[in-house]
Every structure is written in structure tokens, then in C-alpha cells.
UniProtKB/Swiss-Prot annotation:
<comment type="similarity">
    <text>Belongs to the UPF0145 family.</text>
</comment>
<dbReference type="InterPro" id="IPR002765">
    <property type="entry name" value="UPF0145_YbjQ-like"/>
</dbReference>
<dbReference type="Pfam" id="PF01906">
    <property type="entry name" value="YbjQ_1"/>
</dbReference>
<protein>
    <recommendedName>
        <fullName>UPF0145 protein Ent638_1382</fullName>
    </recommendedName>
</protein>
<dbReference type="InterPro" id="IPR035439">
    <property type="entry name" value="UPF0145_dom_sf"/>
</dbReference>
């Protein structure tokens, strides 16, 4: 499965548009990790814990996106948009959502 943020794939003509596909992942934030991430942010370092959670959520969302596309018989997803939002009480959770158009290409 190929993923692209562009509307086309160079050298691979799109022969069929299969439909819009999406993937979402919502992960809760840990209060202790939040506390230490806040301290690290104060002293100017990067928050490895948050970066790891973002990466994990993005991987889950893309896996869902690919599974939906495959179920439609597609071999690629183009025009992908990636969004990040905080949700829940006191913005205690992180949501990553991805969407795009599932397509069949001529290879």
C-alpha cells in the first residue's frame, strides 16, 4: 500500500477512485509523563515521551487507513491529510486522524 499527500503518484496513473478512507487513533496522556514533559519543556529539551506517543498514534491511524483502502480493493491512498487534536476533559487525550482517497493504479 502506498501513501501520498499529493493527489497523484508520479509514474503510476490512477485507473479507479475507490472512495474516501479514514483512520483515527486516540491515546490518553499519563499524568506523570505530563509532569516530567512539562519540566523538560521548561528547560528547553524535547519531550521524548510525547514524541513516542505521537508516533504511535500516527502509526495506528495509518494502519486503519490502509486496512480500509485494502478492503475497497485499492493499492494506494492519495491526497492524505493528517490532523492532530486534543480531546476529552481538560484536553487529556490526543487524537490523530488521517484521511485520503483510496485509488487503484496502473503499475
Amino acid at each position: 500500500m502506498q501513501f501520498s499527500t499529493t493527489p497523484t503518484l508520479e509514474g503510476q496513473p490512477i485507473v479507479e477512485y475507490c472512495g474516501v478512507v479514514t483512520g483515527e487513533a486516540i491515546l490518553g496522556a499519563n499524568i506523570f509523563r505530563d509532569f516530567f514533559a512539562g519540566i523538560r519543556d521548561i528547560v528547553g529539551g524535547r519531550s521524548g515521551a510525547y514524541e513516542k506517543e505521537l508516533r504511535k498514534a500516527r502509526e495506528i491511524a495509518f494502519k486503519e487507513l490502509g486496512e480500509q483502502a485494502k478492503a475497497l480493493g485499492a493499492d494506494a491512498v492519495v491526497g492524505i491529510d493528517i490532523d492532530y487534536e486534543t480531546v476529552g476533559k481538560d484536553a487529556s487525550m490526543l487524537m490523530v486522524s488521517v484521511s485520503g482517497t483510496a485509488v487503484k493504479t496502473r503499475r
